[in-house]
Amino acid sequence: EDVGKIGDVNQGFAGLQEKHGESRVTDTGIREMSIVGQGLGAAMRGLRPLVEIQYLDYLLFALQILSDDAATLQYRSAGGQKAPLIVRTRGHRLEGIWHSGSPMGMILHSLRGMLVLVPRNMVQAAGFYNTLMHCDEPALVVECLNGYRLKEKRPDNLHEFRVVPGHAEILREGSDLTLVTYGSCCRIAMEAADLLQSMGISIEVVDAQSLLPFDVNGLCAQSLRKTSRLLILDEDVPGGASSYLLQQILEVQNGFPLLDWAPVTLTAQAHRPAYGSDGDYFSKPSVDDVVETVWGLMSRAEPGYYPP
């Protein structure tokens, strides 16, 4: 929808229809299930389609076909059929109820069998796309809506640069607490870590960047061996993707015995993002929220050093 003539709503495909023709860069009707269904059919016929859902909130209209058909194809065909479908969308932070949702828990529960990737910026997104172009797995890539106009360090080999699914990345080393997050929250975490450093608290920030699969090398557990404290920062509602991240770190990576204090989650409010230009700020975690949460955790663990 709108990827051809106008080059998508954020101009990510600008000029591609003119360059490659309407047969390769095609506008569709406004029906997400049909868009994904067309892509899935093309993928099963040997092509490598990239389909776009304008906003993450609208992916819910296509969730049934992604869950029933794309995610289960290799499983139910005993590996006999593959569909290298790439679904591109954008979400997390914007304005209003229908353009800034982060229903990642629902997606993670429904799409076992697909890759679910959540790059923190466009360079990381390009690395994932370069990898997926040579991969036979169906994948969902959720880009950051508030990341399109940021200036980033760009590798000279951007067309060859690859990011491997399943590999987390330490963005900042620290010794007092491990903060695990992804997507747009990475910038919030980094800004909060700077403030907390000035207050005498050293935060290790881990970008999961791939939720399915999640941190196959156990980087989060390695970090906990150093810090012994854990905070999950997530834009989904309470008990959404944060619950999945806790299960992966504490159970799959056996991180629970490494903790000296109960793990903490900091999530969005238990409702859809509020209306208005400031609705996102009051509905989702902010830098202030992170600083207050970390200080509260540290004051409970070491009240002598960090008074309540």
Model-based region annotation:
Residues E1-V142, L145-P308:
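Thiamine diphosphate
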